[in-house]
């Protein structure tokens, strides 16, 4: 009889597209993962994957098994959640810790897909101003997964989601001109900026890129809320540095890439042995997270 662990190994290979990435995601060795899949293939009497040089594809047997294996793993997760719920634990709730800008940008679309597949699993979103408090929340066991800039020295699992660009928002009218979607930050040295409150994750980002351009930013307004920055810029207060993912499609100002460039790596971090629900969420996040919205990319081109 196939085991849930074998099904999980098989499904993770499908989700990740290779045995190497699947082993990294599950926190096991590649030979150990291959043994789990091989045991499942022996149990079923057929191969599940066609091994290609850099990827894998499903055989007819592998495709036939897929919906049933997912149903088994999902049913096991629901059974575990139900049992723990009766016991008074927090099962059945996915706790997501995220940097403010992540909650505004990439998470809404991912959560829409997640809720469609897991309508009975509650989601609790815990938002943080800095990577330090985000990491501390994970270390204290307050969240199942954290999403933000890659934390240094994290001892659990780290799934890199990609590189997030920080862009400069400028008021609709007035100098300086934006050329080919770029602007030298040094041209904004004498302009008062929309800055963030001390301790906010993006306050340090603006200070760092301005320092690289040879100036210290003057401040017109400080805001606690990342979502407020585009509104202040559109009102003509001054420029702001924001993650590309939080720029609303309705933004009426101008958008430019800063020179020098500003970007950061985003990752999802979990404990060393995340449960099935958390692992499934991280896999979905890695597949569907959008770090550069099409409407922003179009205006930068």
Predicted features by range, described:
Residues 12-29:
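Short helix-boundary/capping micro-motifs
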Residues 131-134, 139-142, 149, 199-254:
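Hydrophobic hinge/microswitch elements
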Residues 254-301:
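A late-sequence structural motif
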Residues 7, 11, 43-44, 65-87:
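Alpha-helical linker/hinge and terminal dimerization helices associated
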Residues 155-160, 164, 227-274:
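Beta-alpha-beta core module
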């Amino acid at each position: 009889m196939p085991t849930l662990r074998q099904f999980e190994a098989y499904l993770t290979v499908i989700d990740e597209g290779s045995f190497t990435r699947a082993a990294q995601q599950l926190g096991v060795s590649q030979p150990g993962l291959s043994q789990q899949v091989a045991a499942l293939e022996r149990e079923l009497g057929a191969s599940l994957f066609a091994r290609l040089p850099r990827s894998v594809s499903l055989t007819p047997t592998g495709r036939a098994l897929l919906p049933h294996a997912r149903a088994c793993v999902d049913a096991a997760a629901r059974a575990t959640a139900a049992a723990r719920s009766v016991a008074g634990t927090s099962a059945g709730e996915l706790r997501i810790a995220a940097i403010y800008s992540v909650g505004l940008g990439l998470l809404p679309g991912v959560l829409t897909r997640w809720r469609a597949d897991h309508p009975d699993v509650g989601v609790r979103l815990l938002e943080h101003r800095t990577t330090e408090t985000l990491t501390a929340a994970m270390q204290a066991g307050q969240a199942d997964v954290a999403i933000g800039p890659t934390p240094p020295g994290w001892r659990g699992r780290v799934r890199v989601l990609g590189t997030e660009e920080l862009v400069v928002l400028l008021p609709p009218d007035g100098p300086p001109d934006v050329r080919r979607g770029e602007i030298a930050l040094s041209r904004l040295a004498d302009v008062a900026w929309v800055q963030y409150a001390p301790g906010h994750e993006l306050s340090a980002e603006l200070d760092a890129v301005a320092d690289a351009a040879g100036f210290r930013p003057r401040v017109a307004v400080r805001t606690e809320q990342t979502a407020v920055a585009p509104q202040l810029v559109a009102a003509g207060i001054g420029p702001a540095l924001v993650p590309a993912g939080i720029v609303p499609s309705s933004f009426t100002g101008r958008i430019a890439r800063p020179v020098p460039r500003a970007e950061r790596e985003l990752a999802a971090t979990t404990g060393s042995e995340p449960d099935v629900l958390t692992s499934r969420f991280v896999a979905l996040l890695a597949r569907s997270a959008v770090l550069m919205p099409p409407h922003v990319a179009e205006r930068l081109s």
